[in-house]
Amino acid sequence: MLLARIKQLREELNIQQRQMADAIGVDAPMYSRIERGIRPFRDEYIAPMAKILKIDKDELRSLWTADKIINVTKDESDSVAQRALHLAKSE
């Protein structure tokens, strides 16, 4: 979700990967690996990416959080995952 959205926005705005890399303080090959999901996405990338992509930080953070939830619950049945989300919401 997150990485696909970042790539979509980057391409729509004609932003090169090297520009994104500069914004988050990594080299272009590392940025490419991040965008492809080979290297982990870090919290510290959210603010500079949001700025260059002209998007709200909360949208990126929400997508990142959704990806983490999906990753944690991907091996669980839908009912177990839904119950876990319900329990987490009630806390």
Would you name each region that the model predicts?
Residues E11, D22, K51:
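Alpha-helical residues within the helix-turn-helix
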